[in-house]
């Protein structure tokens, strides 16, 4: 089905219901002076609740979101929401950017204008992009899957068809978190259609094809130990979402404060903010993302992607290798990040950038740094590329 324009919905009734629920929150106790040691801080969450109930303006947020061009397109019977903003130049490079969890397409709003209109924002006017930012199935305004199996491999297939439907025979891909997995699979499964891929995260399930019993260098063994320890110390959320997301859904889909605590804790822990999440994200930014999950009732369907990922991890089979050019942008406060040689076992790494600051939510935290790296990488590939199929 051809893409059709989409209007971001707004409901006064839904806002009234949200405020009623916030006002009736049944608060737990907490051990005094423990802050975030046991999870989301009680005083912080009470402050967030007051702001959300009394001052947060969802209608204004919808108006801001609606300044972008939104569409929906049915791909393999799944309705996919996406933003499409055309580049302000004659040779715009098609670029699909995929978000992760617990983010949404909202993560990319700051970076879109930097890529579509670089001349206006101090970038190289010769390198601009047609930017496509879809919502993953089960997130935001995209449909939820009605059958098991909606994993990152299937999503990459949907994205390839979506870009074909938009008229892009060849394109570039970028992503972090689940978006890094989807972009990797696009490079792995559709190399003839890819100009290259740019990643600011390496999926935790990634394993290159290794010989049975292969002895790894200590730097790689050390990384794998650190990653395992990270999941022991900080991965409780992931274990629940990988194993029993439906059980978690009854709490998060019913209580807005439970939902906010579940999501905002991750922004605090994963961003480069030294434990003060409002150093990087305003209350409005945090709550716009949480409210999107609340209004669309998609927290449980988004968590299912972890369940599906456990059954379909990014483990390369013998002979599998991402041969298209790949750029890695390493932000220093990201979760345990593999050494370059571990990544190069599975990827054709042609650019590696050590960023001076930033964490897991790179597009939202450091849009200028990320946009510059994306433009430099794909701009160079575009100049060197002899195949014009990436253009419409």
List where the protein language model places each region:
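C-terminal subdomain of alpha/beta-hydrolase-fold enzymes, centered on the catalytic histidine
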Residues: 241-392
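The serine-hydrolase catalytic nucleophile loop
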Residues: 101-113
